[in-house]
């Protein structure tokens, strides 16, 4: 039996876009120089100072997917390395959602951080080219039945596109598509009693036909 099949085996899943914020990891970096070192390494691959961007912005630039992706890759690896330095348990499985797949590859040693940052910068540029900023949007829908979200997306689409993009967990779905269609879907969901539906801080409608 391999480690992944053992009872209580640890799995780490790295996140995708949307969790970036100005000042992220600032406090940890004051205690652990390895945080900033990871950002510097990733900056060499991305061709931009990711630490300066993540600490001082501008926020609009950090929110553009070609910069969001390498910045979050750097953040994920910085935390992963700190986990290792602090004696964190060795996971049996490393995985990731969307961008997080690249973070998992770097953490597993299949890619260097520099190469990973270079790749996701290009990935972000290609995604932004497919749907220029402002064209698309994404939103998280909490506490709604899958069938309701799917029906609302169909109703809101019209001549545009809005679809369930990610089924994150029971009761948590991310929708995405044309910005106006996403807005229509959010309004319909509120009308139908959905308790929480919020726009995400992303500049492209990932995992939708617009990509």
Q: What are these model-predicted stretches?
A:
Residues 55-62, 103-104, 196-200:
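A short small-residue
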Residues 17-19, 46, 68, 108-211:
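Alpha/beta catalytic cores of group-transfer enzymes, especially the acyltransferase/condensing modules
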Residues 76, 92-100, 104, 112:
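Gly/Ala-rich beta-loop-alpha elbow adjacent to hydrolase catalytic centers
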Residues 37, 71, 98-99, 111, ...:
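An amphipathic alpha-helix/helix-turn recognition signal
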Residues 59-60, 95-99, 124, 136-140:
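Short, glycine/charge-rich beta-strand/loop segments that flank catalytic centers
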Residues 2-95, 175:
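Helix-rich "cap/lid" substructures immediately adjacent to catalytic or cofactor-binding pockets
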Residues 25, 106-108:
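Short acidic, glycine/serine/threonine-rich loops at helix termini
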